[in-house]
């Protein structure tokens, strides 16, 4: 260890510098010295000395965190005796020093929790030494309040620690520990926590007593941690909060059948200070979410009745709900009433009429206070959305009263949004419409709520729309209206158009009537009339948010009323015909296209409107019938014949253009490409006519590149725009005839320009990314469009260009040197990822015979593959899995290489082969199922190749095996641990994890077993012996059945038999392991 940290005094100084100094360089030096200390051999003994003799809290904190790191490491772990000593020392230390700084106490409790979790299956003299959790804390709980707080904190932190997966240890190990803890300790901890809460609530809590408050807070946290435990290993995503079900074990039934448990938390809510109430409500949210199957029907009805009574009591005494945290948790609680119970069950609760009235009043009041806790409104709208959606299915005879209250909620939402406009403009507040995600979420919920009692919703919207539209028109006609008043009306109309779009989008075909379709027509007519008014003013002024709301409505209208599945007799079209003369879908499409062209003309420099407009055009061009109707429109023919910057300003190139702002051009040309293809056939003249603007752009670029002093920025902008346009066309041309015309147009005339650009600007991802993505599109044999004639060399020529581009880019990008972590993906890894995708598409496209390259001495294939290897070796293993797009492109390419180019893989240097095998080994446990499945496939190809080569080498007849095969065999024989590790990993996943791709896992497993029969036999014995004695015979039998009837070959019939056996094996193993805790060392089996 370095000199500066030899003494405790110096360690104390370094801790002080680390945590207190404001000088960055001093802090960094201290951090560096302390990192050296952490990694030194003396760390353990010095940490104990720091805890014993350290004079500052910071040195105690350092000691606790260092010890936590030491006990957490998966390589070179501390001996069991040492970990037991540390655990005992920490408990004694906490018991003798109740006045430690809170952060030191917390760090020591974290250390205890980590040791206990990681040692959960460690045993000594047939006793699990780290499971005496309740015994460990009993001495704290029986002492003063201060000690009691420490004891409860230990249980709380331990429960939380065991519930959280740790990236440095296998997920299987985590699940086994969590399951064992759940079955052996968690219910006792929960019961203890509830009993202590009952004792605390029975006493009158002294508001001035800080330690009592701490105890109550820690008890509530502990209870919440118990209820929030991931009982069945589903790792629920917090973002799907309103769908959460708490999978309480059946053994806990008694606690929930006892109404006093539920009553305890409602009583606590009303009796304790408001700052504790959010945690109480969080516990109630979890209790309200217990799985339905925990109860029979009568028990569930009784439980729901108590729950609804508690909610009613809170609504009748709502004073504490003025606190935002209480309000938020209470809204979550209300949402759980419907996510976990059916409307038919709710209406049977005795107080339902009164409760639904109170909830409606609460919701209306909440919506009227739109500026207060907008994120909490989501839960209220979620409740009403679910209630409204259930109305058609409710069978109960009791009235649900939603026809009374749902319109009130709809009205409150609509009117409150309109009233907010003036206040936001007047006071300069943040406009909710700026948060598109939140608004869309609320509108999705309103779409269902508003369709309930739809006639009332429509009447309200028509009345409010007519008022605002009339006022708006009068203000415009006056010519001198204050801008504030205009802005208010435009804001109100924006909300109304969004809401109209939402309720139209909420139409459900089986529950809609002609009358409702006619109402939709009434609403759409008004919006189209408003559009005519606003479009007529675009030359002078326009409102971006209002335009975006109209595009939102058009998108909803398209989904519901345009397309192959829509009944053309819809009353909506009759209403449009009566009012606006729009008799059918074609005439409405004409309006849409007119609006699209208008937007592109006037809003070409407004990215949000341009991208939304082009997305609408793109969506319209996908429908089979709508695209054929569109092509007949004169406006569409105009677009096909005039797609230049003169008519569409967003296609223009100027010095203000940002290279990344051109993405929408791809969308535009994808739509145009689809429209062109409808009648294109093999008409080369029509194709040439369409491509004229792009031809001119390429010719201009060629002239620039030929001159020595061209404007680089202008050339980049022209090229990126052109390449994005071409990618859109290439994507749309998925028929052979049209794609061949495009290929003949770009090759060989313009391909050199793309290659030259890669050479010049390889370091600028704004240029290289679009070019590489275009190449990926050109080599992608989508819909078998790349089927060249037998006399055509075009397939090979295309691959040569591909190889040249990958090699040029790859060799140059590797010259960039070390890059900052935050720029690594953008500047390097993204380009490498696309190169992998290009190569994968080319190799798997089935239009090139790759055998001819070596035969004729063509180095294109070899160059591309060697570049792949160079690029791969420049990427650390961790980055391969850290960046999802890179993972997917690499593993899908590797799948193709191992399937069709195994001789190339076998010829690689040993360190490259080991790199690839390591990447497969790590990918087998990836969270991304696509990556995991790809790795299984790669491993299967490699194992099959190995098996075949070994089989051949065992036979004396025939030609000798190729040299690379022998080298590959030799490498694998030198490193058997790699294949053995993968065998244990695959078996581990199949036996112990939630294996979502069992078939894929089964394919390489047979080959792995046949290649490692001795290792498999040892592994099998280890697994069997790790089971409790009474389960060992059953596990032994499972393995016997797995290999029953399996021969020593990899023929298809034998593989299929093994796959069937494996399904049965997995079922039997799971049945065998149910209700049993695994033996002490089973978790170490393959970790």
From Swiss-Prot:
Transmembrane segments: none annotated. The keyword Oxidoreductase does not apply. Expressed in oocytes (at protein level). The keyword Nucleus applies. One of its GO terms (cellular component) is cytoplasm. This is Exportin-7-A. Pfam families: IBN_N. Keywords: Cytoplasm, Nucleus, Protein transport, Transport. GO terms for biological process: protein export from nucleus. It is found in: Cytoplasm; Nucleus. The gene is xpo7-a. Mediates the nuclear export of proteins (cargos) with broad substrate specificity. Residues 30-96 form the Importin N-terminal domain. GO terms for molecular function: nuclear export signal receptor activity; small GTPase binding. Belongs to the exportin family.
């Amino acid at each position: 260890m370095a000199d500066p940290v030899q003494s405790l005094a110096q360690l104390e100084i370094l801790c002080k510098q680390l945590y207190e100094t404001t000088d960055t360089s001093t802090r960094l030096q201290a951090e560096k010295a302390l990192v050296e200390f952490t990694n030194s051999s003396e760390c353990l003994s010095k940490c104990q000395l720091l805890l014993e003799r350290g004079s500052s809290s910071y040195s105690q904190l350092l000691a606790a965190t260092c010890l936590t790191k030491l006990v957490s490491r998966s390589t070179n772990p501390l001996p069991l005796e040492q970990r037991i000593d540390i655990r005992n020392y920490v408990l004694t230390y906490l018991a003798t020093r109740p006045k430690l700084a809170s952060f030191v106490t917390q760090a020591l409790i974290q250390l205890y929790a980590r040791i206990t979790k990681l040692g959960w299956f460690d045993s000594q003299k047939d006793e699990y030494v780290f499971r005496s959790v309740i015994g460990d804390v009993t001495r704290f709980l029986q002492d003063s309040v201060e000690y009691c707080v420490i004891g409860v904190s230990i249980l709380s932190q331990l429960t939380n620690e065991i519930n959280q997966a740790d990236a440095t240890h296998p997920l299987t190990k985590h699940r086994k520990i969590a399951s064992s803890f759940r079955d052996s300790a968690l219910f006792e901890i929960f019961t203890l926590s509830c009993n202590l809460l009952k004792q605390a609530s029975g006493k009158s809590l002294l508001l001035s007593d800080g330690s009592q408050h701490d105890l109550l807070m820690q008890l509530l946290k502990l209870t919440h941690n118990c209820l929030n435990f991931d009982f069945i290993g589903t790792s629920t995503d917090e973002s799907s909060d309103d769908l959460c079900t708490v999978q309480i074990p059946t053994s806990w039934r008694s606690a929930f059948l006892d109404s006093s448990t539920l009553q305890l938390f409602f009583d606590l809510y009303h009796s304790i200070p408001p700052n504790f109430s959010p945690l109480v409500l969080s516990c109630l949210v979890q209790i309200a979410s217990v799985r339905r199957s925990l109860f029979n029907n009568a028990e569930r009805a009784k439980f729901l009745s108590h729950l609804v009574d508690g909610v009613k009591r809170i609504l009748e005494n709502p004073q504490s709900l003025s606190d935002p945290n209480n309000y938020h948790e209470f809204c979550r609680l209300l949402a759980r009433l419907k996510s976990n119970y059916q409307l038919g069950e709710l209406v049977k609760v005795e107080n339902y009429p009164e409760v639904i009235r109170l909830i409606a009043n609460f919701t209306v009041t909440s919506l009227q206070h739109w500026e207060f806790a907008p994120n909490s409104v989501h839960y209220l709208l979620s409740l009403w959305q679910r209630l409204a959606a259930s109305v058609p299915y409710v069978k109960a005879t009791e009235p649900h009263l939603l026809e009374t209250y749902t319109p009130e909620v709809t009205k409150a939402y609509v009117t409150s949004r309109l009233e907010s406009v003036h206040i936001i403009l007047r006071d300069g507040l943040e406009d909710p419409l700026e948060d598109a995600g939140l608004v869309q979420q609320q509108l999705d919920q309103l779409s269902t709520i508003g369709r309930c009692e739809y006639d009332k919703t429509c009447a309200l919207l028509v009345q409010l729309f007519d008022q605002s539209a009339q006022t708006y028109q009068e203000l415009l006609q006056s010519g001198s209206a204050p801008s504030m008043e205009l802005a208010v009306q435009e804001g109100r109309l924006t909300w109304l158009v969004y809401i109209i779009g939402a309720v139209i989008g909420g139409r459900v075909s089986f529950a809609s009537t002609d009358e409702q379709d006619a109402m939709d027509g009434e609403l759409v007519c008004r919006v189209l009339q408003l559009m005519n008014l606003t479009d007529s003013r675009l030359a002078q002024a326009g409102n971006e948010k209002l335009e975006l709301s109209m595009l939102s409505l058009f998108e909803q209208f398209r989904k519901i009323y345009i397309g192959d599945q829509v009944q053309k007799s819809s009353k909506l079209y009759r209403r449009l015909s009566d009012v606006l003369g729009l008799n059918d879908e074609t005439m409405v499409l004409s309006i849409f296209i007119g609006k699209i062209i208008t937007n592109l003309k006037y809003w070409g420099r407004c990215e949000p409107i341009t991208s939304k407009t082009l997305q609408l055009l793109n969506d319209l061009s996908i429908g089979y019938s709508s695209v054929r109707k569109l092509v007949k429109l004169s406006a569409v023919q105009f677009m096909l014949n005039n797609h230049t910057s003169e008519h569409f300003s967003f296609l223009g190139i100027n010095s203000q253009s940002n290279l990344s702002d051109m993405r929408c051009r791809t969308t535009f040309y994808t739509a145009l490409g689809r429209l062109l293809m409808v009648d294109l056939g093999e008409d080369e003249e029509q194709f040439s006519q369409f491509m004229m603007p792009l031809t001119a752009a390429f010719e201009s670029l060629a002239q620039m590149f030929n001159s020595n002093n061209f404007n680089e920025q202008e050339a980049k902008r022209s090229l990126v725009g052109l390449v994005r346009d071409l990618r859109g066309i290439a994507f749309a041309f998925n028929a052979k005839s049209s794609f061949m015309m495009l290929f003949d147009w770009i090759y060989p005339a313009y391909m050199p320009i793309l290659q030259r650009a890669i050479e010049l600007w390889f370091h600028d991802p704004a240029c290289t990314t679009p070019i590489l993505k275009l190449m990926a599109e050109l080599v992608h044999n989508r819909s078998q469009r790349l089927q060249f004639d037998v006399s055509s060399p075009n397939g090979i020529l295309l691959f040569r260009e591909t190889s040249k581009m990958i090699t040029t880019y790859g060799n140059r990008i590797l010259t960039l040197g070390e890059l900052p972590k935050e720029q690594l993906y953008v500047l390097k890894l993204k380009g490498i990822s696309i190169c992998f995708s290009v190569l994968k598409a080319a190799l798997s496209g089935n239009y090139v015979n790759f055998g001819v390259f070596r035969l004729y001495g063509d180095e294109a294939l070899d160059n591309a593959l060697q570049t792949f290897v160079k690029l791969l070796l420049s990427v650390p293993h961790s980055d391969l899995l850290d960046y999802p797009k890179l993972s997917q492109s690499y593993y899908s390419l590797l799948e193709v290489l191992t399937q069709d180019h195994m001789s190339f893989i076998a010829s690689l240097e040993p360190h490259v082969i080991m790199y690839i095998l390591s990447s497969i080994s790590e990918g087998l446990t990836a969270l991304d199922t696509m990556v995991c499945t790809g790795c299984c496939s790669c491993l299967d190809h490699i194992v099959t190749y190995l098996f075949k080569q070994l089989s051949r080498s065992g036979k004396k007849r025939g030609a000798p095996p190729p040299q690379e095969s022998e080298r590959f065999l030799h490498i694998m024989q030198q490193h058997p641990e790699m294949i053995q590790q993968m065998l244990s990993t695959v078996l581990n996943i199949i036996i112990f994890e939630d294996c979502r791709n069992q078939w894929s896992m089964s394919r390489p497993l047979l080959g792995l077993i046949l290649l490692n029969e001795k290792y498999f036999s040892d592994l099998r014995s280890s697994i069997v012996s790790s089971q409790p004695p009474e389960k060992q015979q059953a596990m032994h039998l499972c393995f016997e059945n797995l290999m029953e009837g399996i021969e020593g070959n990899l023929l298809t019939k034998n593989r299929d038999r093994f796959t069937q056996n494996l399904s049965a094996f997995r079922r039997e193993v799971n049945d065998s392991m149910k209700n049993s805790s695994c033996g002490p060392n089973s978790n170490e089996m393959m970790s």
